[in-house]
Amino acid sequence: MSSASYVFAIVGTVTSIAGVSIRGAFPDLSIWLLIVLVMVVYALLTAVIRIYKLIRTKAGVQLRVNGNPVEIKVGDLFSCNGWKVIPFNEFYDTTVDNITISRHSLNGVFIEDHVDSLQELNSLIDKDAQTSLSPPKAAENGRLKFELGTLKRYKGEFLLLAFSHFNDLNEAHLTMSEYEECLVNLWREVSRVYSGIPVFVPLLGSGLTRFDESGWSPSKQDLLKCMICTLRTSKASFSAPITIVLTEGAFEETNPYDLKGWI
């Protein structure tokens, strides 16, 4: 809900409970003074609500899931100090051309701004065979296809995640059940490789990925709940905190505080 909606809701509720109108409360004021009064009250309430939301957003939400410390906060994933999870498709494609990979996606920003050599990255992806999951298989196009949830370490600060399928129409996609299975695999893989270092994860599935269920796509709140739920069911254990990093827009569309009563 926007700040304006909150203000109108508050004013409407108060006047309804009190059983008065603004005009009735100030019968001696001219209409112009009443308008000024309403604008001042509106501005003050809007400012208070925005300050409250800003403080709440910066503070984040702290949870414990199976004893694991988990934080949900707004931030820039790339500025976080620790392992940063970057979603790729199942082939670990690295071509940023706004067709295979969008320049504006986390995947695209990572490759263009944080990869020194694509040849080195591609070589690492092909040669790093350490995984608790199934080994990669050769697809019809001859490329290696990795199980969803597979992680590849890069530069000691990035965890590259095989997150989605990729079809001939250059669409990243998966079903909701595959999404859940991918997350369970992710948490178990993170537990294997994190080495006691904090891990930062974006809100997976909130970008360009398509869900195969016809006519339906999960809300950001659904995705957030699913990430927490799969962490719980994975039985993975961490000594360092797991942080789910949201954009400001995603934070506005979710209610992380609701998760405290849901866990």
Where does each model-flagged region fall?
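Macrodomain-like recognition of ADP-ribose-binding/processing modules
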Residues: 1-263
